[in-house]
């Protein structure tokens, strides 16, 4: 049994982690908003946690972050929460004698890269990705034989009642029973089911690992595959029409961001993703749970 301190216990992934492992590990969480978990401490600011709050724990998992929020256009705010606060919490954990600090990061540190491997340069293109990369680098610099930093960079997560922006849009489109333009989509994108992600995080704590990790589902999917899986889960028939090349070129020119998300590739090297700490993820399931409408 591990003694685990979770920061950001009111986040979705943290809640999934707590529910799965509350009976097998000793978990205490600090949250900004109450969730009803018995061993929860609600605070106004995580940065104000005293060093003593970290004492006696084997590992700290930091889920606290500002993620992609279009209304926030201030790099300083992202840096303050995702970078400086994360490093401050890690410093306090190290001072208190905690052996491992697990930082939830993101593949957004690679910007628009379509293939991610050990040699892919880190070139974030958003405030979110930039702030996370700054934290990742400083936390790794803090890592030593007494204090291990583990950086987890997952792709888009889904499942457990959660469907992020673009996936939720696809679910709603499928629910409308209209033809969709993905019949010729042969792209490859990595995703991770929330169950796979929390199991990977727990395995990282259990094995006391350090370094940078890229957990994913077992195989990548094309947008066409995703639509077919959504249709199967919802029990509906969806017509996927092939898209003329002139249409795709127009979308790529006018909305390159949309083209990348729907027809572009985001694939993590399989050896990098799957063999790091012996995890054995399953394939895409439960994508549409509680996400229709």
Positions of PLM-derived features:
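N-terminal Rossmann NAD(P)H-binding glycine-rich loop of SDR-like oxidoreductase domains
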Residues: 4-23
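NAD(P)H-binding glycine-rich loop region in Rossmannoid oxidoreductase-like domains
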Residues: 46-84, 88, 92, 112
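Mid/C-terminal beta-alpha module of Rossmann-like enzyme folds, strongest
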Residues: 200-258, 291-292
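Flexible, glycine-rich beta-alpha linker
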Residues: 110-111, 152-168
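Active-site Tyr-X1-5-Lys
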Residues: 123-150
């Amino acid at each position: 049994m591990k003694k685990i301190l979770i920061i950001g216990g009111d986040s979705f992934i943290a809640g999934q982690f707590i529910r799965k492992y509350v009976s097998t590990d000793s978990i205490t969480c600090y949250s900004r908003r109450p969730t009803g978990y018995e061993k929860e401490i609600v605070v106004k600011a995580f940065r104000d946690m005293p060093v003593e709050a970290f004492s006696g724990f084997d590992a700290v998992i930091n889920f606290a972050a500002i993620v992609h929020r279009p209304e926030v256009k201030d790099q300083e705010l992202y840096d303050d929460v995702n970078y400086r606060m994360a490093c401050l919490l890690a410093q306090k954990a190290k001072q208190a004698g905690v052996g491992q600090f697990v930082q939830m990061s993101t593949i957004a540190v690679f910007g628009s890269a379509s293939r991610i491997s050990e040699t892919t340069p880190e070139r974030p293109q958003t405030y979110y990705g930039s702030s996370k990369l700054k934290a990742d680098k400083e936390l790794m610099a803090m890592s030593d034989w007494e204090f291990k930093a583990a950086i987890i960079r997952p792709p888009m997560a889904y499942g457990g009642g959660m469907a992020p922006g673009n996936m939720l849009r696809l679910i709603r489109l499928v629910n409308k029973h209209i033809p969709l333009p993905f019949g010729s989509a042969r792209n490859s994108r990595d995703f991770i089911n929330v169950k796979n992600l929390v199991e990977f995080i727990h395995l990282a704590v259990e094995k006391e690992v350090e370094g940078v990790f890229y957990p994913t589902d077992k195989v990548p999917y094309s947008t066409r595959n995703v639509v077919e899986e959504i249709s199967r889960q919802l029990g509906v028939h969806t017509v996927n029409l092939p898209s003329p090349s002139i249409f795709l070129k127009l979308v790529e020119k006018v909305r390159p961001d949309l083209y990348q998300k729907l027809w572009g590739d985001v694939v993590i090297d399989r050896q990098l993703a799957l063999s790091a700490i012996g995890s054995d993820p399953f394939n895409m399931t439960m994508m549409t749970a509680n996400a229709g409408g």
